[in-house]
């Protein structure tokens, strides 16, 4: 199997430079990083890819059993690292991909020079028993998934602007809506369940590689308490709160996002 084809891999930037691997979130593809990439290319080897089922990945490689949990995606990340053979990478995971990086690094820490967890959430669902605040009640998530199942395109048009934030810049929400609408609805329904129902809180403590937790100053999907929780649970991690708002700072504030990635990667890669 050619993983470069399967995951539509692109390698760009400075040959021989420290390696930064960028992983997109739900309903997106590698194009979400397009404003950040030119800012990283002068100093880093940049690896872009699409998760199987997203973007220009090989859809024939998608199957329900493998991608019904975060584990299948984490396995793909490790396979990419091995097959590309670029040495330890700084893995930058946005949103749900942050937890894929956590799982992958816990399994094979030698593959990673570090992790950047951008707008991460180990669980979107509040847990009153422990006091954990994920931002949504279980009922909220059930309603969200029911709405997605009933009318994926309609759900995309409603939710994308909420996820993106920045209501004064509606073009950002429109871009995310378009990205959602390009995703196969069947694949999106399953990936939404992986995204919104997974609970990776107990996996955080297993991370041993240098980690930067980067969160927006206001994010309707992952409130500040979530970033603080991730930082608290990953030993030795750093936490930075960006001035950016919304759940996709790589689009809303690419310069600030790239600067945070570069500052961290430059000290760990």
Where are these regions (language model features)?
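Conserved alpha/beta-hydrolase "nucleophile elbow" surrounding the catalytic nucleophile
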Residues: 24-26, 89, 93-95, 216
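Acidic catalytic loop of the alpha/beta-hydrolase fold
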Residues: 218-222
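Flexible "cap/lid" loop of the alpha/beta hydrolase fold
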Residues: 102, 106-107, 111-150
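Active-site loop/oxyanion-hole signature of alpha/beta-hydrolase fold enzymes
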Residues: 2-5, 51-92, 96, 259
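Conserved HGGG/HGGXW glycine-rich cap/lid loop of the alpha/beta-hydrolase fold
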Residues: 8-66, 80
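Short beta-strand/loop motif that positions the catalytic acidic residue
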Residues: 207, 213-215
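Conserved alpha/beta-hydrolase catalytic His-Asp/Glu region
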Residues: 126-127, 131-135, 146-205
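Catalytic active-site module of serine/aspartate enzymes centered on a nucleophile-bearing elbow/loop
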Residues: 237-269
């Amino acid at each position: 199997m050619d993983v470069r084809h399967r995951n539509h891999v692109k390698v760009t930037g400075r040959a021989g430079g420290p390696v930064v691997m960028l992983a997109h979130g739900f309903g997106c593809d590698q194009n979400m990083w397009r404003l950040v990439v030119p800012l990283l290319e002068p100093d880093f080897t940049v690896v872009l890819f699409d998760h199987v089922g997203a973007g220009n990945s090989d859809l024939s490689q998608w199957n329900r059993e493998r991608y019904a949990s975060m584990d299948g995606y984490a396995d793909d990340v490790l396979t990419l690292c091995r097959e590309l053979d670029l040495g330890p990478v700084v893995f930058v995971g946005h949103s749900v991909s942050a937890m894929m990086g956590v799982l992958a690094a816990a399994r094979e820490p030698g593959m990673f020079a570090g992790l950047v967890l951008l707008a991460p959430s180990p669980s979107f669902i509040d847990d009153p028993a422990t006091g954990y605040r994920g931002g949504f009640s279980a009922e909220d998530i059930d309603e969200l998934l029911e709405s997605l199942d009933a009318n994926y395109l309609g759900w995309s048009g409603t939710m994308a602007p909420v996820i993106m934030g920045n209501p004064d810049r509606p073009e950002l929400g429109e871009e995310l809506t378009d990205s959602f609408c390009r995703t196969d609805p069947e694949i999106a329904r399953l990936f939404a369940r992986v995204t919104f129902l997974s609970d990776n809180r107990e996996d955080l403590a297993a991370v041993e590689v240098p980690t930067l937790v980067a969160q927006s100053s206001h994010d309707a999907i992952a409130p500040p308490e979530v970033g603080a929780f991730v930082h608290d649970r990953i030993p030795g991690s750093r936490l930075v709160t960006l001035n950016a708002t919304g759940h996709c700072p790589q689009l809303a504030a690419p310069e600030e996002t790239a600067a945070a990635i570069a500052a961290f990667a430059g000290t760990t890669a």
